[in-house]
Amino acid sequence: MSSEEDKITRISIEPEKQTLLDHHTEKHFTAGEIVRDIIIGVSDGLTVPFALAAGLSGANASSSIVLTAGIAEVAAGAISMGLGGYLAAKSEEDHYAREMKREQEEIVAVPETEAAEVAEILAQYGIEPHEYSPVVNALRKNPQAWLDFMMRFELGLEKPDPKRALQSAFTIAIAYVLGGFIPLLPYMLIPHAMDAVVASVVITLFALFIFGYAKGHFTGSKPLRSAFETAFIGAIASAAAFCLAKVVQH
């Protein structure tokens, strides 16, 4: 909650109730966007270099070639994914600013219509006309609060964090790099690619399983199901790349 919103809340809430709020702490998970970026980065970082390494191993490439190509892919993938996260966040910012300007103009141009929309929104929550009329009138006296209300409850938009774009870019890129080096580790230690690919499969599938379990835990889905699904997708991708390389080679 921003300082401005906190000020509004403290002014409008009775002292006794404000005291209760000040001494009450709710344990909610509030890092959803960061977790989403980590999931995107790690899942792609584990899967894409894993499939590439398996495909090159299937084509009988040496460990040094697989490692070189893998590192190049991790670097390019991290930049690409990070840039994608940055552009997506900037698009959200632009969309919010555009909709806020439009809503602000409507509040000035057609205030009666906008007030009717406030009443309609409140009525959807089972609030009677005699109960929501004071709320509508109070919002009309405070244009900024009125605008915030319409943005949240009519359009369902939350104001983006201005730091979100860079945060998303770096989080996704770093997560991609961390995930991408796991399937490449065996190629750093084992000179024969066909031996390295076996170790890579074991290590990466285990990492995918652990990652899938953690993803399920944080997203609220069934952890074991998420773990098996994530590992299965990685196995399919690497097997397809390996088999395709063998087919092309022959």
Curated annotation (Swiss-Prot):
GO biological process, one term: iron ion transport
Membrane topology designation: Multi-pass membrane protein
Substrates-to-products reaction catalysed: Fe(2+)(in) = Fe(2+)(out)
InterPro entries (alphabetical): Ccc1_fam
Use in biotechnology or industry: Over-expression of the Arabidopsis vacuolar iron transporter 1 (VIT1) in cassava plants (Manihot esculenta) increases accumulation of iron in cassava roots and stems. A transgenic approach to increase vacuolar iron sequestration in cassava may represent a viable strategy to biofortify crops in micronutrients.
Domain remarks in the Swiss-Prot or TrEMBL record: The cytoplasmic metal binding domain (MBD) is located between transmembrane 2 (TM2) and transmembrane 3 (TM3).
The protein's assembly and partners: Homodimer. The dimeric interaction is mediated by both the transmembrane domains (TMDs) and the cytoplasmic metal binding domain (MBD).
Protein name (record): Vacuolar iron transporter 1
Native source organism of the sequence: Arabidopsis thaliana (Mouse-ear cress)
Lineage: Eukaryota, Viridiplantae, Streptophyta, Embryophyta, Tracheophyta
